[in-house]
């Protein structure tokens, strides 16, 4: 059955859209900002957690000594491999559920593609507050619309998933719902293991290319929220058609052996992306 419940747009939605980057002062000490972001708990390595268990999955994990945006699982006696990733930024979904969830699917696809694979299908874990709260149900409806939009674009059917409602806390007798968190798990296929692509810079004399248009956009960023303590902004610029075309181009570059590594820009922005790519082989970077 299809539920037809009441839903309404929260008051904050239009308020968040009024954010202006010019209202944020640019810090004088950018080195201090870089150190702050690098140590941020949402950005820093989670190795201390996942190394507590069998993170190598026996001998099947091909990402152990070859870091990739998506986890690569070896298919023995085959030239193919599986690429897997889990993605969601609840802050962006809260700011704009439809765009935020569409972006979560797109980021999952981006991780698969940057690793040398092709997106195949998704599952999900949808975490929301009380569905009888019209504003919470509005978040849920928007998230489903965004997920559907991206899945159609990337041709990734939803093979399964679950919905968890009533995730909330009671503060002074008031129900506070969690941020809407439609977590996306995506499976991809690497048709040829030779196409597996690391996120790490490989050679000190390599050139670094930024693909896609770079915009002066800090909306919903970890930098804006954690460093400036500013929590009211909408989602950053996102165009699903441009995203799809860009991922198609990256896939072509990988298959034609035109690039040595690929890494998507995510939490922490361009600086963190460059830092993550440079650390594994102890290589620095110089950019203009």
Where in this protein do the model-derived segments appear?
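Glycine/proline-enriched, intrinsically flexible loops and inter-domain linkers
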Residues: 1-288
């Amino acid at each position: 059955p299809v539920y037809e419940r009441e839903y309404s747009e929260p008051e904050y939605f239009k308020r968040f859209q009024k954010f202006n980057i010019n209202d944020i002062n640019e810090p004088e000490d950018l080195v201090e900002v870089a150190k702050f972001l690098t140590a941020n708990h949402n950005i820093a390595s989670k190795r201390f957690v996942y190394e507590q268990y069998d993170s190598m999955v026996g001998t099947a994990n091909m990402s152990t000594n070859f870091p990739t945006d998506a986890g690569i699982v070896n298919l023995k006696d085959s030239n193919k491999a599986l690429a897997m990733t889990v993605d969601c930024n609840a802050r962006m979904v809260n700011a704009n559920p439809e765009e935020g969830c569409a972006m979560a699917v797109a980021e999952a696809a981006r991780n698969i593609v940057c690793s040398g694979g092709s997106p195949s299908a998704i599952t999900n874990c949808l975490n929301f507050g009380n569905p009888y709260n019209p504003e919470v149900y509005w978040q849920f409806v928007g998230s489903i619309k965004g997920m559907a939009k991206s899945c159609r674009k990337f041709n990734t059917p939803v093979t399964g998933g679950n919905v968890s409602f009533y995730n909330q806390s009671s503060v002074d007798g008031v129900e506070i719902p969690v941020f809407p968190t439609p977590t996306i798990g995506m499976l991809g296929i690497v048709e040829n293991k030779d196409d597996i692509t690391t996120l790490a810079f490989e050679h000190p004399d390599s050139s670094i290319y930024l693909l896609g248009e770079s915009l002066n956009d800090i909306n919903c960023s970890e930098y804006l929220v954690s460093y400036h303590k500013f929590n009211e902004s909408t989602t950053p610029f996102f165009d699903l058609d441009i995203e799809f075309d860009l991922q198609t181009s990256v896939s072509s570059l990988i298959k034609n052996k035109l690039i040595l590594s690929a890494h998507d820009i995510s939490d922490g922005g361009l600086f963190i992306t460059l830092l993550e790519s440079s650390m594994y082989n102890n290589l620095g970077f110089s950019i203009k």
